[in-house]
Amino acid sequence: MDKHSLQQQVSQLKRKNIENEDLSDVRKEDIKKPMSAELGIKSIFYDPDWNPSGKAPFGLKNIPYNPRTFRRDTPIEPRLNGLKEIPLPKPNIKDQDQKSS
């Protein structure tokens, strides 16, 4: 066997071992980290009764809330960007007729 080809094979094996070790470390880290879809009690979708894992509904992204800035069940003050009075839309006559029938 040629000395050059033997060295080449050894270096390839070392590279493969290094690549496999790196991948195994990444896999271990993925297992340790919580899934972004399920954040548990830190999820904005968390509810102890209907969503204890805090999993995001289909089509929505789950992000952890900041407990210093996000408070549950607090009244929300609307921001009207300087508008003082916004006229409400007039009720639709057809809708009122259907409700009374």
Swiss-Prot record:
Q: Does the keyword Transcription regulation apply?
A: no
Q: What is its main location?
A: cytoplasm
- Which cellular compartments is it found in? Cytoplasm
Region (Disordered) residue ranges read 1-21, 70-101
Which cellular component terms (GO) are annotated to the entry? cytoplasm
Source organism of this protein record = Kluyveromyces lactis (strain ATCC 8585 / CBS 2359 / DSM 70799 / NBRC 1267 / NRRL Y-1140 / WM37)
Q: Which domain of life is it from?
A: Eukaryota
Q: Does the keyword Cytoplasm apply?
A: yes
Pfam families named among the record's database cross-references: NpwBP
**Ranges of Basic and acidic residues composition bias in the record:** 92-101
Instruction: Please give the name of this protein.
Output: Altered inheritance of mitochondria protein 4
